[in-house]
Curated annotation (Swiss-Prot):
Lineage: Bacteria, Bacillati, Mycoplasmatota, Mollicutes, Acholeplasmatales
Presence of the UniProt keyword Cell inner membrane in the record: no
Ribosomal protein keyword on record: yes
Source organism per UniProt: Phytoplasma mali (strain AT)
GO cellular component terms, A-Z: ribonucleoprotein complex; ribosome
Protein name: Large ribosomal subunit protein bL36
InterPro entries recorded: Ribosomal_bL36 (IPR000473), Ribosomal_bL36_sp (IPR035977), Ribosomal_LSU_bL36 (IPR052010)
Length: 38
């Protein structure tokens, strides 16, 4: 999970999720794309 100031979708499989005021990008197929904002 990378922590970034700005998160972007890197592939069509990425899903944007908001949890507890934080933005996450989750990808089940390619877990290296997982990101968190903040």
């Amino acid at each position: 999970m990378k922590v970034r100031s700005s998160v972007k979708k890197r592939s069509p499989d990425d899903i944007i999720v908001r949890r507890k005021g934080r933005v996450y990008i989750i990808n089940k197929k390619n877990r290296r794309h997982n990101q968190r904002q903040g």
